[in-house]
Amino acid sequence: MDKVLDNKIENVLDSADRMFIATSVGGNSSGASVFFSRDGEDLVFFTFNPTRKAEQIRLNPRVHVVIWPKGQEGIEGLQIDGECYKIKDEDEKKKAYELVLNTTEAFQEYMEDDFLIKNDVVGYYRVKPTTIKYVNFYEEEQFQWKTIPGNKTSALKMAFKLGLKRIGLWLRTVRAPFLTATFAPIFIGAAVAWSDLKDNGIAENWSWKMFWLVLGGASLAQVATNASNDFFDHTSNADEINKVASPFNGGSRVIQVGLMTPGQVLITALVSIAGTVGIGLYLNQQVSGNFFGNTPILWTGIIGTFLALGYTGDPVRLGYKGFGEIAIALGFGPIMVMGAHYVLTAPIHNNVLGLWNWIEALIASVPIAILVMLIVWINQFQDAPSDAAVGKNTWVVRTAVNDGWMRLEKPLSLYKQFMVEAFLAVAAIGLLGMFTDYGTVYAFAALLPVLLVWKAFKMADEWMIKWNNPDADRQKVPYELLLVNVSTIGIHFLTGNFDFCSLYSIACLSLQTFQKYTNFMMG
């Protein structure tokens, strides 16, 4: 019987070249028809890695496959449950390449494209069946099953793998790698606060608890901003029609590739902003004695919440009306720096506004505000055509010339001007430190990333030539700007977090903490 069933299964597989594969993550189901080739009992196929099915397979390898021979749809066929994995071994990739070409040459151009291969845009996948159901409505026994236990991952191992991937999904949803945009202003606000405490002779009043609460609250605010941006860019179709998305533009794509529902993303935003509000009110109570005390903490919290949800959220939609860049600069510049500074210098001012050294914190926030805005600015270059199509009037869209093709010379010129102004502001803080109490000479160390700035400018100019070339591949050129996107993030991170003033302050604080610990241990 087993041999007879094996022959029936092989006959179906040999007489078909396409299969329908169903994938699912968190209740989001997808289906796609793909060409396949046999490799023993395994099924091998080629696809693009950013597609919905490939993204869902990466998170949940369990798939369902339906195969019907040509002309026998619905009469004789196979229904297969299995586990699907992306092929990573180079020898296996070569084998998969040959197998797929034996079935179809329709995708050969993409399979051999060096750019797509280098950037991991295309890939080969293997389905390992765990259960094969043979269906034939003309036979007396219409359904017959074959199980392949060796292909099935143990329940415990699968649960562990899915758990890790679920964590990865949440990190992707909140765009965790971009939380450096929050770390930099909080670190700067903390560095200025530590300096003020030290100058007032009360450095021992530094509170790590308050520092971590500030950092956590600010990080949740950014998560809320990112998630709400994903949700509202989905409802406006901005991310749906964006065909050149990357890790730096086009959102997290968790909605578009079926990893999370729009409702789940919106809930993520609302829960995150609720966490921010809760932490903010607690900090306000600690500083003022009242959860709703009239303090800068309360007002920066209100403004920050408005900017986070109103960046792309209805009905405000700041990002669609040309105010998004300003919102980003304010939210991740003065609001975070000054908010952190106010909380951490509470032992000095005791909630008396006139005793708060806000000017120094404001000045320190200027360079980082410009630089974080430039991260968004350069990331909007790839998004410009799709943003313009849905009426998202960012300043890149507003300043570009659209004559059938989006000309980005003016936005690039402004990018460079703002970058120069950011480092002039850094130098100004250093000069102020030489003659006043409103700066620090250690700020000069933050000029070191200028070398990276020069490199970013050079790469951007080279990219602009390609972008304006009418013969250029419009699907590939946007991805060639990624090095400039990465460089801009690096410039912001290095300038904010490797400012010697910050390192010096934190080092002194760490030394003091270490000394206290040593004294305690020595009795």
What are these regions (language model features)?
Residues 435-523:
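Extended hydrophobic alpha-helices typical of membrane-associated regions
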Residues 16-49, 55-57, 63-69, 76-80:
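Short beta-strand segments
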Residues 159-213, 217, 221, 225, ...:
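Topogenic membrane-insertion module of multi-pass membrane proteins
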Residues 220-246, 373-396:
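Acidic (Asp/Glu-rich) catalytic motifs at the cytosolic membrane interface
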Residues 186, 200-228, 296-309, 354-378:
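Membrane-embedded alpha-helical segments that form the functional core of polytopic membrane enzymes
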Residues 251-350:
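Intramembrane alpha-helical segments
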Residues 243-289, 392-439, 479-489:
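Multi-pass membrane catalytic core of lipid/isoprenoid biosynthesis enzymes
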Residues 2-4, 76-159:
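Charged, gly/pro-rich active-site loop segments
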